[in-house]
């Protein structure tokens, strides 16, 4: 026996489901990453928060010792996008913070006063640390890659690499 309820047919069900979806979406808070403005002196402490591997939730915090205030998620708040997956390290050189995000295969260059991205270097295997030799040359070590990358920080590009032939996958990374 088939039970047929009046008004419970496709003509009613489809619009009802659509209406419920619209009502629920209207109640949800969507965060599209609105950008905030910062005007710090750059004189403070940056804290790279590694985040969980493969969750893309790394973040950058800034502690101002004068105000004794910590600002969390400053990269996200200044740029409207997440830092990425596993913030490994950060180096400051000439007013630019270089944030190495290893599982996202990127190094972000940020203004240390505004936290805004001013450039990025991409196409690494899994970068870990950056070491500057000059304004136009830096080395980037990696994990699970037997090369040390040579980059030009002014042009935000990889210019070459140094082979480390005795490095094996068991030894892990080129900084060892």
PLM regions: where:
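Predominantly soluble domains enriched in secretory-pathway, periplasmic, or organellar proteins
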Residues: 26-176
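Sec-dependent bacterial lipoprotein signal peptides
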Residues: 1-26
């Amino acid at each position: 026996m088939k039970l047929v309820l009046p008004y419970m047919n496709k003509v009613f069900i489809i619009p009802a489901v659509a209406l419920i979806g619209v009502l629920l979406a209207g109640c949800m808070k969507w965060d599209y990453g609105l950008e905030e403005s910062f005007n710090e002196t750059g004189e403070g402490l940056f804290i790279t928060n590694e985040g969980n591997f493969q969750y893309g939730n790394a973040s950058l915090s800034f502690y101002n010792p004068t105000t004794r205030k910590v600002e969390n998620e400053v990269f996200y708040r200044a740029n409207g996008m997440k830092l990425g997956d596993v913030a490994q390290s950060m180096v400051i050189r000439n007013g630019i913070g270089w944030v190495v995000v290893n599982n996202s295969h990127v190094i972000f260059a940020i203004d240390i006063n505004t936290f805004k991205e001013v450039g990025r270097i991409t196409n690494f295997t899994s970068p870990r640390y950056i070491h500057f030799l000059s304004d136009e040359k830096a080395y980037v070590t990696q994990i699970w890659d037997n090369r040390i990358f040579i980059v030009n920080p002014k042009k935000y590009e990889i210019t070459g690499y140094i082979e480390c032939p005795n490095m094996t996958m068991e030894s892990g990374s080129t900084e060892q």
